[in-house]
């Protein structure tokens, strides 16, 4: 791959590309240095500048697509983080189901089982809220 890039890129294209990289796009499009150059070296420079202007046009064309991809990735990430809230609901159901089964087996341990159930409920709910917080961070903070 490096050999292909080395053959395809001339030094003038690399210089022109690095010059465009730190300039604003409007300045790169509006100021055409190939108009002021003449002679044998200008053909290579014109080819390099045309390649750079094609890259600039491609940037204008794909910026909307890039934004759409970023938005879709945000929604997918937020949806994946929201799955943790469903896991929290399943965990809470398991905790209180185990409380009922434990109380049915040994009613004398009612107070101790209930305190463990409250602890399990709190931990499961905290994980659900954490997943919901991450989903909102993905949607609105990124």
Swiss-Prot record:
Alphabetical UniProt keywords: CF(0), Hydrogen ion transport, Ion transport, Lipid-binding, Membrane, Methylation, Mitochondrion, Transit peptide, Transmembrane, Transmembrane helix, Transport
PTM notes: Trimethylated by ATPSCKMT at Lys-110. Methylation is required for proper incorporation of the C subunit into the ATP synthase complex and mitochondrial respiration.
Membrane topology classification: Multi-pass membrane protein
Chief place where the protein resides: mitochondrion
N-terminal signal peptide: none
Cellular component terms (Gene Ontology): mitochondrial membrane; proton-transporting ATP synthase complex; proton-transporting two-sector ATPase complex, proton-transporting domain
GO biological process: proton motive force-driven ATP synthesis
Family: Belongs to the ATPase C chain family.
Name of protein: ATP synthase F(0) complex subunit C3, mitochondrial
Source species of the chain: Pongo abelii (Sumatran orangutan)
């Amino acid at each position: 791959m490096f050999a292909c890039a080395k053959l395809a890129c001339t030094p003038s294209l690399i210089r022109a590309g690095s010059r465009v990289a730190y300039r604003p796009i409007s300045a790169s499009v509006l100021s055409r240095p190939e108009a002021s150059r003449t002679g044998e070296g200008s053909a290579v420079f014109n080819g390099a500048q045309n390649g750079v202007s094609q890259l600039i046009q491609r940037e204008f064309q794909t910026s909307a697509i890039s934004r759409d991809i970023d938005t879709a990735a945000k929604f997918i990430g937020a949806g994946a983080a929201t799955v943790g809230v469903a896991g929290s609901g399943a965990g809470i159901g398991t905790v209180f189901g185990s409380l009922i089964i434990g109380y049915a087996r040994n009613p004398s341990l009612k107070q101790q089982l209930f305190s463990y159930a409250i602890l399990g409920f709190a931990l499961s709910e905290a994980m659900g809220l954490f997943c919901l917080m991450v989903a909102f961070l993905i949607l609105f903070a990124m």
